Curated annotation (Swiss-Prot):
Molecular-function annotations in GO: 5-epi-aristolochene synthase activity; magnesium ion binding; terpene synthase activity
UniProt domain comment: The Asp-Asp-Xaa-Xaa-Asp/Glu (DDXXD/E) motif is important for the catalytic activity, presumably through binding to Mg(2+).
Record organism: Nicotiana attenuata
Cofactors named for this entry: Mg(2+)
Binding site for Mg(2+) 3: D444, T448, E452
Motif DDXXD motif, residue numbers: 301-305
Pathway named in the protein's UniProt entry: Secondary metabolite biosynthesis; terpenoid biosynthesis
Family, per entry: Belongs to the terpene synthase family.
Pfam family, one: Terpene_synth
Protein name, UniProt field: 5-epi-aristolochene synthase 2
Keyword Translocase assigned: no
Organismal lineage: Eukaryota, Viridiplantae, Streptophyta, Embryophyta, Tracheophyta
Length: 548
């Protein structure tokens, strides 16, 4: 921690400043333009490959197990967004046929795919793989692919899927002991899955890994599908790099790195988060709006967390609630910079959406931002006054400061088919949204505990839990882990049909939970310190294209 003396009003204020590392990326993403000739060439070939793949998907002279494997491969290769309607119709048919399989591998794959697409298939299909004592048969220990599919299936479980608790424990133990003796690329796939299960992974990260590290090395691979996936990944990457260049220029023009040096400079990492919410080309506008929002709220977070005084933060909170540029004169100079930038950003959003007659929806995101800032202010007051809230009071405030209610709402702004009732549904904090927010809160709190403790924070989630329950740090962290597991079950339940809104609008909520799982893996704060966790992912998704 460093100290900074700043002349403010007529007195000198000594501020505790979190010593954040500079951006890892410099200006490397500033200038990128798509090579239209290459993009056009890729797009033409993709169209032809798309038709071949569609024909393959719709072919009827094939075993059901092979159809499930084909869908799984297409999804893992990241090209399923081209065939959403076809895949949904096939899975709907399979679900309504009540098909069952004798082998664990296909049964588990069927279960996971159907659940991930919202079909509430019964976990009783696994009872045939248990002995008379209700334990999974030890003879399954040699079925590595079956175990891997069982392991992946166990992560889509809900509260009533007790059999899948046993499935997770059983498959994990056997996969861990067998992994060192497996051949490549199965060994890499199992090792990766044990560290990062598919259901909780960021889709683009999982796609890149599967294409380059697994599918390309499989003897049974389909060369046409592999080529399609590589071309599609690289073409999308061009679009993503173009978006990042646009956002990087916007960020550079704001010049926060110079004018607000106390804050984290993480616009590239913010883009990774937006890309994690949706990667498909039709969400380009939505992604750019979301990354700008994440970057801006990160500045606000650091203002509350690492710089502002009580008096300043109260004035800032009040100004945000009033949402009026005339309030700017009440703020110290450094706060004027971010306040004006925030109001300008939302004016830009309104202007951008007005051509489609949708500018009125921006108010939903503004109200959520006001909520975040109010709760940030409560947190900073607790810190300054040394208040130690009970864990229930802490959580009622801290769920909003994850920013996930706000980001979920913002993620809808650029989604062209969103309607007013979707925002109304979201504003009521439905259980699936609450689950995603809880996952973010408890995982973030666990990963950042030591750093916040070193800054003198006593109102952290882990500290509150330790005091309330009279438990050790490890026991408190275990409690938080249990909360995350419960929330994942709620989230998985919320994806099952019938759903109150279109699955298209549930996916960003699911993906926000996935991003936090990946960013804070192994209890590391990958956002504040991206070099270990996010840097390799950013290189894979935004720097290096796939060799074709």
């Amino acid at each position: 921690m460093a100290s900074a003396a700043v002349a403010n009003y007529e007195e000198e204020i000594v501020r505790p400043v979190a010593d954040f590392s500079p951006s890892l990326w410099g200006d490397q993403f500033l200038s990128f333009s798509i090579d239209n000739q290459i993009a056009e060439k890729y797009a033409q070939e993709i169209e032809a490959l798309k038709e071949q793949t569609r024909s393959m998907l719709l072919a009827t002279a094939r075993k059901l197990a092979d159809t499930l494997n084909l869908i799984d491969t297409i999804e893992r290769l990241g090209i399923a967004y081209h065939f959403e309607k076809e895949i949904d119709e096939i899975l709907d048919q399979i679900y309504n046929q009540n098909s069952t399989f004798d082998d664990l591998c296909t049964s588990a794959l069927q279960f996971r795919l159907l659940r991930q697409h919202g079909f509430n298939i019964s976990p009783q299909i696994f009872s045939k793989f248990q002995d008379e004592n209700g334990k999974f048969k030890e003879s399954l220990a040699s079925d590595v692919l079956g175990l891997l599919n069982l392991y992946e299936a166990s992560h889509v479980r809900t509260h009533t899927d007790n059999i899948l608790e046993d499935a997770l424990a059983f498959s994990t133990v056997h996969l861990e002991s067998a992994a060192p003796y497996m051949n490549s690329p199965l060994r890499e796939q199992v090792t990766h899955a044990l560290e990062q299960c598919l259901h909780k992974g960021v889709p683009r990260v999982e796609t890149r890994f599967f294409i380059s590290s697994i599918y390309e090395k499989e003897e049974s691979k389909n060369d046409m599908l592999l080529r399609f996936a590589k071309l599609d990944f690289n073409l999308l990457q061009m679009l993503h790099k173009q978006e990042l260049a646009e956002v990087s220029r916007w960020w550079k023009d704001l010049n926060f790195v110079t004018t607000l040096p106390y804050a984290r400079d993480r616009v590239v990492e913010c883009y990774f988060w937006a890309l994690g919410v949706y990667f498909e080309p039709q969400y380009s506008q939505a992604r750019v709006m979301l990354v700008k929002t994440i970057s801006m709220i990160s500045i606000v977070d650091d203002t509350f967390d690492a710089y502002g005084t009580v008096k300043e933060l109260e004035a800032y909170t009040d100004a945000i609630q009033r949402w009026d540029i005339n309030e700017i004169d009440r703020l110290p100079d450094y706060m004027k910079i971010s306040y004006k930038a925030i109001l300008d950003l939302y004016k830009d959003y309104e202007k951008e959406l007005s051509s489609a007659g949708r500018s009125h929806i921006v108010c939903h995101a503004i109200e959520r931002m006001k909520e975040v800032v109010r709760n940030y202010n409560v947190e900073s007051t607790w810190f300054i006054e040394g208040y130690k809230p009970p864990v229930s009071e802490y959580l009622s405030n801290a769920l909003a400061t994850t920013t996930y209610y706000y980001l979920a709402t913002t993620s809808y702004l650029g989604m062209k088919s969103v309607a007013e009732q979707d925002f109304e549904w979201l504003s009521k904090n439905p259980k699936i949204l609450e689950a995603s927010v809880i996952i973010c809160r408890v995982i973030d709190d666990t990963a950042t505990y030591e750093v916040e403790k070193s800054r003198g924070q006593i109102a952290t989630g882990i500290e509150c839990c330790m005091r309330d329950y009279g438990v050790s740090t490890k026991e408190a962290m275990d409690k938080f882990q249990k909360m995350a597991e419960t929330a994942w079950k709620d989230l998985n339940e919320g994806l099952l049909r019938p759903t109150p809104i279109s699955a298209e609008f549930l996916t960003p909520i699911l993906n926000l939970a996935r991003i936090v799982e990946v960013t804070y893996i192994h209890n590391l704060d990958g956002y504040t310190h991206p070099e270990k966790v996010l840097k390799p992912h950013i290189i894979d998704l935004l720097v290096e294209s796939i060799q074709i």
